[in-house]
């Protein structure tokens, strides 16, 4: 690298440092003093279910006053308690209302009533990366790299705030109107200085240290990035089997096989991300994220232009207008029932 290039890289790294320091100030203000009850259910018309989960659903709604469309996540308090997800749910809302980054879905309102918790987020009409990946089969390396770069920047931001994301997978990445990523579902995100021990995540994406019940840190997100890049470029994940236990055996074995069409730079990056030895895993070494950003596979990536959303996306999802749901599957609709008596009030006081 010439002197000029090195100097440019150095000054870029300096301005990133300044940016992250300021971002942390903004985050901490909201983290320490979270917003509460910023809307109510009758402010919205409910249109259609976009997805369902074990303790709730996500619905497309329209804000009556502004006419804006949003995605409303509705969580049944009793089910959250039964499934021991109180902590995770409180975490999700507290984190979402405090973060601010171009590739993180924005929480616009949150509130609760006798039965449910509600998080109202910006609606991302392009649907999940998962459905586009399955339809197309696999993404070309430049296409995969465009998305990967956004995740790298997002993790750099989150990790600088001591947040671990812990749930990277194509189902949690939505594609917006401009073809950029919006990371959604902060149900497993956690603010951790040092290490944590909770077993959570999706089998194919779990880092070996989580499976082996070791204390782990944000390096688990860099492992998951390796799994995601592999799955985007191959069309299937690096470790898969019928039963979770068989997947776990493959993950901890440290053996990965690559399709023959992977470029040598891609294979090299993945060997360094899907690295069982934490003292060698990229993202976890003394240069931190810069080992990843400066890797040859990302040589053509203009990180600042990606952050500013100035790079032309390789794929723009088709959609017919603000409330279009054609990029989402259909689900059976269910009435939202609200009890006349308060359920689980004290568990969720801080929501």
Curated annotation (Swiss-Prot):
Binding positions (ATP): 50-58, 73, 122-128, 169-172
Membrane protein topology class: Lipid-anchor
Keywords: ATP-binding, cAMP, Cell membrane, Cell projection, Cilium, Cytoplasm, Cytoplasmic vesicle, Flagellum, Kinase, Lipoprotein, Membrane, Mitochondrion, Myristate, Nucleotide-binding, Nucleus, Phosphoprotein, Serine/threonine-protein kinase, Transferase
Active site: 167
Modified residues (Phosphoserine): 11, 140, 339
Record PTM Phosphotyrosine, positions in chain: 331
Catalytic function, reaction form: L-seryl-[protein] + ATP = O-phospho-L-seryl-[protein] + ADP + H(+); L-threonyl-[protein] + ATP = O-phospho-L-threonyl-[protein] + ADP + H(+)
GO biological process: adenylate cyclase-activating G protein-coupled receptor signaling pathway; adenylate cyclase-inhibiting G protein-coupled receptor signaling pathway; cAMP/PKA signal transduction; cellular response to cold; cellular response to glucagon stimulus; cellular response to glucose stimulus; cellular response to heat; cellular response to parathyroid hormone stimulus
Every AGC-kinase C-terminal domain range: 299-351
Posttranslational mods: Asn-3 is deaminated to Asp in more than 25% of the proteins, giving rise to 2 major isoelectric variants, called CB and CA respectively (0.4 pH unit change). Deamidation proceeds via the so-called beta-aspartyl shift mechanism and yields either 'D-Asp-2' (major) or 'D-isoAsp-2' (minor), in addition to L-isomers. Deamidation occurs after the addition of myristate. The Asn-3 form reaches a significantly larger nuclear/cytoplasmic ratio than the 'Asp-2' form. Autophosphorylated. Phosphorylation is enhanced by vitamin K(2). Phosphorylated on threonine and serine residues. Phosphorylation on Thr-198 is required for full activity. Phosphorylated at Tyr-331 by activated receptor tyrosine kinases EGFR and PDGFR; this increases catalytic efficiency.
Enzyme class, spelled out: transferase
Lipid-substituted positions (N-myristoyl glycine): 2
Localization per Swiss-Prot or TrEMBL: Cytoplasm; Cell membrane; Membrane; Nucleus
Domain Protein kinase, residue spans: 44-298
Matches recorded under PROSITE patterns: AGC_KINASE_CTER (PS51285), PROTEIN_KINASE_ATP (PS00107), PROTEIN_KINASE_DOM (PS50011), PROTEIN_KINASE_ST (PS00108)
Pfam families associated with the record: Pkinase
EC number of this enzyme: 2.7.11.11
CDD domains: STKc_PKA
UniProt KW Transmembrane keyword: no
Function in brief: Phosphorylates a large number of substrates in the cytoplasm and the nucleus. Phosphorylates CDC25B, ABL1, NFKB1, CLDN3, PSMC5/RPT6, PJA2, RYR2, RORA, SOX9 and VASP. Regulates the abundance of compartmentalized pools of its regulatory subunits through phosphorylation of PJA2 which binds and ubiquitinates these subunits, leading to their subsequent proteolysis. RORA is activated by phosphorylation. Required for glucose-mediated adipogenic differentiation increase and osteogenic differentiation inhibition from osteoblasts. Involved in chondrogenesis by mediating phosphorylation of SOX9.
Record-linked PANTHER family: CAMP-DEPENDENT PROTEIN KINASE CATALYTIC SUBUNIT ALPHA, CYCLIC NUCLEOTIDE-DEPENDENT PROTEIN KINASE
Membership in a protein family: Belongs to the protein kinase superfamily. AGC Ser/Thr protein kinase family. cAMP subfamily.
Subunit and partners: A number of inactive tetrameric holoenzymes are produced by the combination of homo- or heterodimers of the different regulatory subunits associated with two catalytic subunits. cAMP causes the dissociation of the inactive holoenzyme into a dimer of regulatory subunits bound to four cAMP and two free monomeric catalytic subunits. The cAMP-dependent protein kinase catalytic subunit binds PJA2. Both isoforms 1 and 2 forms activate cAMP-sensitive PKAI and PKAII holoenzymes by interacting with regulatory subunit (R) of PKA, PRKAR1A/PKR1 and PRKAR2A/PKR2, respectively.
Name listed for the protein in its UniProt record: cAMP-dependent protein kinase catalytic subunit alpha
Organism: Rattus norvegicus
Gene: Prkaca
């Amino acid at each position: 690298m010439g002197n000029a290039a090195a100097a440019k890289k150095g000054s870029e790294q300096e301005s990133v440092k300044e940016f992250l320091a300021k971002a942390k100030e903004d985050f901490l203000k909201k983290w320490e003093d979270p917003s509460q009850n910023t809307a109510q259910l009758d402010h919205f018309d409910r249109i259609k279910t976009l997805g369902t989960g074990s303790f709730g659903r996500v619905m497309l709604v329209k804000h009556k006053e502004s006419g804006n469309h949003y995605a409303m996540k509705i969580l049944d308090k009793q089910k959250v308690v039964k499934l021991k997800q109180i902590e995770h749910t409180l975490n999700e809302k507290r984190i979402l209302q405090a973060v601010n980054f171009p590739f993180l879905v924005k929480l616009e309102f949150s509130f609760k009533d006798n039965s449910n918790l509600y998080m109202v987020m910006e609606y991302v009409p392009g649907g999940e990366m998962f459905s586009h990946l399955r339809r197309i089969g696999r993404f070309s390396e430049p296409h995969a790299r465009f998305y990967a770069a956004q995740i790298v920047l997002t993790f750099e931001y989150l990790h600088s705030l001591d947040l671990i994301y812990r749930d990277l997978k194509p189902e949690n990445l939505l594609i917006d109107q401009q073809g950029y990523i919006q990371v959604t579902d902060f149900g497993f995100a956690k603010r951790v200085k040092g290490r944590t021990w909770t077993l959570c995540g999706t089998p194919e994406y779990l880092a070996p240290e989580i499976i082996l019940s070791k204390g782990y840190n944000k390096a688990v997100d860099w492992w998951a990035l390796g799994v995601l890049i592999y799955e985007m470029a191959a069309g299937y994940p690096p470790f898969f089997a019928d039963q979770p236990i068989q997947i776990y055996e493959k993950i901890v074995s440290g053996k990965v096989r690559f399709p023959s069409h992977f470029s040598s730079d891609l294979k090299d990056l993945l060997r360094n991300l899907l690295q069982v030895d934490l003292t060698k895993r990229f993202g976890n070494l003394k240069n931190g994220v810069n080992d990843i950003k400066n890797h040859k596979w990302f040589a053509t990536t203009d990180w600042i232009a990606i952050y500013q959303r100035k790079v032309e996306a390789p794929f723009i999802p088709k959609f017919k207008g603000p409330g279009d749901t054609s990029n989402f599957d259909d689900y059976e609709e269910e009435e939202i029932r609200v009890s006349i008596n308060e359920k689980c009030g004290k568990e969720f006081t801080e929501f």
